[in-house]
Amino acid sequence: MLTWKNNLTPVSEQFDDIYFSPENGLEETKHVFIKGNDLYNRWRNWNIQNAFCILELGFGTGLNFLTTWKEYLEYKDRFRLHFISIEKFPLNREEISKALSIFSELVEIKKEFLSSYQDLIPGMNYFQFLGGKIHFSLFLGDVSSALCEISGKVDAIFLDGFAPSKNPEMWDKSVLENLKYVSKKGTTLSTFTVARMVRDSLSFSGFKLEKRPGFGRKREMLIGSYSDSFLESNPKEKPWCKRAYPELQIKTVAIVGAGIAGTTLAYSLSRRGIQVFLIDPSGIAKETSGIPMAISHPHLTKIPGPISLFTLRAFRYALSFLSSFADQNFFEKTGLFHSVTQEMDSERLQKGIENHKLSEEIVFWKPIASKFQNGDFLENEPGVFFRNGFWTRPESIAKKCAEQPGVEFIKGTASRIEQDGTSWKLLIQESGHEIVANSIIFCNSHSIGKLIASLFEGEEPFPIRKVRGQLISLKETEKSSRISNILCAEHYLTPSILGEHILGSTFDEFDLNPLPQKKDTDRLLEFVQNKYPSLNFDSSCVLIEKVGLRAQTPDRLPILGPVFDPREFRKIYKEIDLPKNRNKKFPNLKTIQGLYVFGGLGSRGILSSFLGSEIMASLILGEPVPVESSVLEHLHPARFLYRKVRK
């Protein structure tokens, strides 16, 4: 709850403290945090590939972030900026807008920021601004748990919670000591407070500290730098999925597979200045990614779990990304209504909203007999409504991603890989041409493990299976043309786009026939006729039948991360060495430098690909990733073998 001092300076009622100096909050930010971390000088001399990464404890009104954004503009053509902030009690858009209204210098930046500051979820929220030059990760939650969820190292730290006497939880000894897990040699920090307990905790963590003149009425402030050359590992990261940082600068990457995973990854990497070779024997999005339309919404579970946590994060980033990337011809936020089904029963859906602490801005429960915008045929349908559920045309998105400068498409089959010093060679079968790159990423759907297996005596370490799906397009009827939202139950129906609906999709693990089958068309028609009889669909409405073979993992989450040797894994983590005692020390899993996989997206290819590509790009470059380490663990390629060995 906010009050206002002189109707200008925001004050927290909970902590009885101001958010920034009433004298000049913007100049205070520059003095304490920008100059306190020597950012102008460091930015002038920043000549490495990686983003400059800042961690802030206490987002508040966003003043520090927006001021940093403004000061960074002079350097935007030289490097990227990644700003990570933690906030337990986030302000809403109206409060932030009013709080920052006194700073005329920030008007345009504030406007751009607030246009994306929506659909927030507990935990990590990831944004991009300035055409991908600024990455922003906002963690909503407790600071002590948030610090253990950051996977990666930062270059500077802003400590800006309310005063230690007002908000002791943020300045707790354990919180400050955990800063070593996100620090590396040369990481700097600054803060407005010089309290003894703060200095002692930071010194104990490995920071060399120095007092400096404070801002305004504050006599002193504190600066520091991390002096330990040893990189402390996050104790929450398990040995088999610890981060492996690149040993060399990454300049060239070869991506095998030009579906939605490969093309979105090519886009993410090329925007980071990396030359990308995109290789596929068929062309851009010519296999399963070539479906005419895909729909997206988060997957709600009764209690938060790996699938719901990942899909919520992926959904909100996909919305943010597509809103600036796509045009109305291949992306539209129509809203999505999901009816109660046997699998998605009312308790699961309602408890899912409650237990994930989701606002009505994202999803709400619609009880029976409530009015709804899609007309009378839905008035007796209970379910949930995702306000920003959307449809896309995957092939159009894939092609636009592949047109990004720095992406070279090569039509051909990758037939052999071999290591060449610190690089990798990849042979193109048709031309005999060899591509040399610092890294290779395999994004080729259910063929993802075939080339990799040649390195491991024929063993494919990734359990990906084919799952057949068939969809049909339907000519609109007079009644169906009035549908404004995507309708979901056991299957889904899109609104009419240019006179045509998409009705999908079947799910068959046993029949892998690549051709459309009448029995599946009949099954889909039977569903829509029984579920929405007043729409008057019949077999004469069928226009197109399309089949795709999804690449599905056993846990229905993507496989995303570094390649490892399964033989070495079993040697290290033998069954007899996996005790119940979690405190026993194990060696970290050694991954194969320069080889990565990104696949197994299943029926959530569009939903997973945008955030998945950003995670992959961060892993390849050794930067902080835009999801929690606990979420990242459930995407790691070694997770299936680990579970198997544990048995």
Curated annotation (Swiss-Prot):
Catalysed conversion reaction: 5-aminomethyl-2-thiouridine(34) in tRNA + S-adenosyl-L-methionine = 5-methylaminomethyl-2-thiouridine(34) in tRNA + S-adenosyl-L-homocysteine + H(+)
Cofactor(s) listed: FAD
Subcellular locations according to the entry: Cytoplasm
Highest rank taxon of the organism: Bacteria
Keyword Zinc assigned: no
Region annotated FAD-dependent cmnm(5)s(2)U34 oxidoreductase, chain positions: 256-647
InterPro entries in alphabetical order: FAD-dep_OxRdtase, FAD/NAD-bd_sf, MnmC-like_methylTransf, SAM-dependent_MTases_sf, tRNA_MAMT_biosynth_bifunc_MnmC, tRNA_MNMC2, tRNA_S-uridine_synth_MnmC_C
Gene Ontology CC annotation, any one: cytoplasm
EC number per UniProt: 2.1.1.61, 1.5.-.-
Region span, tRNA (mnm(5)s(2)U34)-methyltransferase: 1-227
Pfam families referenced in this protein's UniProt entry, alphabetically: DAO, Methyltransf_30
Molecular function (Gene Ontology), one example: oxidoreductase activity, acting on the CH-NH group of donors
Functional summary from the UniProt entry: Catalyzes the last two steps in the biosynthesis of 5-methylaminomethyl-2-thiouridine (mnm(5)s(2)U) at the wobble position (U34) in tRNA. Catalyzes the FAD-dependent demodification of cmnm(5)s(2)U34 to nm(5)s(2)U34, followed by the transfer of a methyl group from S-adenosyl-L-methionine to nm(5)s(2)U34, to form mnm(5)s(2)U34.
Protein name, as recorded: tRNA 5-methylaminomethyl-2-thiouridine biosynthesis bifunctional protein MnmC
Gene source species: Leptospira interrogans serogroup Icterohaemorrhagiae serovar Lai (strain 56601)
Recorded name of the encoding gene: mnmC
